[in-house]
């Protein structure tokens, strides 16, 4: 079975893929290309995921998977959306992004939100395929938990009565937006092997 190449340098994302593809070698693109970076100019998660997977597939001449994901807060008209990673500005980190979001929600009652993940799979001379996963939750007023990354410490999942940062990687793989999208991808790849 071929390696699963992920067009990301984000170890958190790579770990999410490894948690589901336990019997395959999952590698980040930095192991194959030094300083791979694609400007995310798309207006949607799908456009950004495709930009990354298509550029990486072209550069490596092999199948590559990429994702774009983020947080959509309903009371903020979908913000931070595609700007989730740079919500507080370029050069800022997860803590800065969380702080900006909590400030923007300071007097807001409706704190419903969803994480969205679109995975794209591209290969030379093939049409890019996409897989979308979501998970619904509520933005807390303070951080809880140490597991995960990004907005996980303030994203509360009512069904689990925990934030995403309080659940195990295995639990996260089963319910998270990325976990849902990765499972759809895995199902597709397993079906591909039986053709």
Swiss-Prot record:
Keywords: Hydrolase, Magnesium, Metal-binding, Nucleotide metabolism, Nucleotide-binding. GO terms for cellular component: cytosol. One of its GO terms (biological process) is nucleotide metabolic process. Substrate binds at residues 8-13, 69, 149-152, 172, 177-178. The active site is at residue 68. Pfam families: Ham1p_like. Mg(2+) binds at residues 39, 68. Its cofactor is Mg(2+). The keyword Metal-binding applies. GO terms for molecular function: dITP diphosphatase activity; ITP diphosphatase activity; metal ion binding; nucleotide binding; ribonucleoside triphosphate phosphatase activity; XTP diphosphatase activity. It is an enzyme of class 3 (hydrolase). CDD domains: HAM1 (cd00515). InterPro entries: dITP/XTP_pyrophosphatase (IPR020922), ITPase-like_fam (IPR029001), RdgB/HAM1 (IPR002637). Its EC number is 3.6.1.66. Homodimer. Belongs to the HAM1 NTPase family. Pyrophosphatase that catalyzes the hydrolysis of nucleoside triphosphates to their monophosphate derivatives, with a high preference for the non-canonical purine nucleotides XTP (xanthosine triphosphate), dITP (deoxyinosine triphosphate) and ITP. Seems to function as a house-cleaning enzyme that removes non-canonical purine nucleotides from the nucleotide pool, thus preventing their incorporation into DNA/RNA and avoiding chromosomal lesions. This is dITP/XTP pyrophosphatase. The lineage of its organism: Bacteria, Bacillati, Bacillota, Bacilli, Bacillales.
């Amino acid at each position: 079975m071929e390696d699963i190449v992920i067009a990301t340098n984000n170890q958190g994302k790579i770990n999410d893929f490894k948690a589901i593809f336990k019997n395959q070698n999952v590698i980040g693109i930095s192991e194959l290309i030094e300083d791979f970076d694609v400007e995310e100019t798309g207006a949607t998660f799908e456009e950004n995921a495709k930009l990354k997977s298509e550029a990486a597939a072209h550069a490596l001449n092999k199948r590559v998977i990429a994702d774009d994901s983020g947080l959509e807060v309903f009371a903020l008209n979908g913000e931070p959306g595609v700007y989730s990673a740079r919500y507080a500005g370029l050069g800022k980190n997860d803590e800065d992004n969380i702080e900006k979001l909590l400030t923007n929600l300071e007097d807001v009652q409706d704190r419903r939100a969803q994480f969205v993940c679109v995975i794209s799979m591209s290969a030379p001379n093939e049409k890019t395929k996409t897989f979308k996963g979501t998970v619904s939750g509520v933005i807390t007023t303070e951080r809880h938990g140490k597991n995960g990354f990004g907005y996980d410490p303030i994203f509360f999942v009512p069904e689990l009565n925990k934030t995403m940062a309080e659940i195990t990687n295995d639990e996260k793989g089963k319910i998270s937006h990325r976990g849902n999208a990765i499972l759809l991808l895995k199902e597709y790849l397993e079906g591909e092997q039986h053709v």
